[in-house]
Design a protein with these regions (language model features):
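Bacterial Sec-dependent N-terminal signal peptides
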Residues: 1-23
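Short glycine/proline- and aromatic-enriched beta-strand/turn motifs that initiate or cap beta-hairpins
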Residues: 19-69, 187-200
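Transmembrane beta-barrel outer-membrane domains
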Residues: 29-31, 46-50, 85-91, 128-136, ...
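Outer-envelope beta-barrel architecture signal
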Residues: 30-34, 62-64, 104-110, 149-153, ...
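Transmembrane beta-barrel strands of outer-membrane/channel proteins
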Residues: 34-42, 59, 68-72, 110-116, ...
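Outer-membrane beta-barrel proteins
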Residues: 47, 77-80, 119-125, 164-168, ...
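Gram-negative (and chloroplast) outer-membrane scaffold detector with strong preference
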Residues: 63-137, 145-147, 185-188
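Predominantly the C-terminal beta-signal and adjacent terminal strand-loop region
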Residues: 146-200
Length: 200
């Protein structure tokens, strides 16, 4: 929980920063618009590398954005119990964040995913499925590179906190999905700058 609080505090503190003009590797980019794109996530909880893929999109206002996301694990974990079973996590919800200063070629990127979903359990022998609803909070912080004015890549460190797992129902420890990780976020869209002009 202390790790989660630390990451969330870092995210909130970044909201006090403001950007100005845009710099990109191959062109000039804007600051107000919208974007969408895929997200790849690696988490290292319980000595187990968990890979999730998904995507998100948002409206950009200044250096901040507000939108939604969806994620799901791609490598289900097999838990060897009395009755072996496969466990997966899927979740989606709100996505808020910012880039500071976004006009720079390389700049700070911070966001938080606030969502709901379920831990899915499938037993090996009879294919029985159990769903346990959960709440997910995942702050992240890192750097982003402006490739083109319409394309950016962010590499971040995150902490995923999953609340609501009931071990009595799922047989999964309530902290099974909690832990640090790393994200790659690919953002495609219009990052417009409507109030500032570039100097010749």
């Amino acid at each position: 929980m202390k790790n989660l609080i630390l990451f969330f505090a870092l995210f909130l503190s970044s909201l006090t920063l403001f950007g100005q003009q845009q710099e990109t590797l191959f062109g000039k980019s804007n600051v107000v618009g919208a974007f969408g794109g895929p997200i790849v996530e690696y988490n290292f909880a319980n000595d187990n590398t968990q890979v999730s893929v998904g995507g998100g999109g948002a409206v950009i206002i200044g250096d901040f954005f507000l939108g939604g996301y969806g994620m799901g694990t791609t490598n289900p974990s097999w838990i060897d119990n009395v009755d072996p079973f496969k466990v997966e996590l899927g979740h989606g919800g709100f996505w808020i964040g910012g880039t500071f200063p976004s006009h720079k070629l390389v700049h700070f990127f911070s966001s938080a995913k606030i969502g709901w979903g379920a831990v899915n359990i499938r037993f090996y022998d009879d294919n029985v499925r159990i769903d346990d609803n959960v709440f997910v909070l995942e702050p992240e912080a890192g750097v982003e590179l402006n490739i083109f004015r319409w394309f950016r890549i962010a590499a971040t460190a995150n902490y995923r906190w999953v609340d609501g797992i009931n071990p009595a129902i799922t047989g999964v420890d309530r902290n099974y999905y909690n832990g640090f990780g790393a994200n790659l976020t690919f953002r495609f869209g219009g990052f417009g700058n409507h109030w500032q002009k570039w100097d010749d």
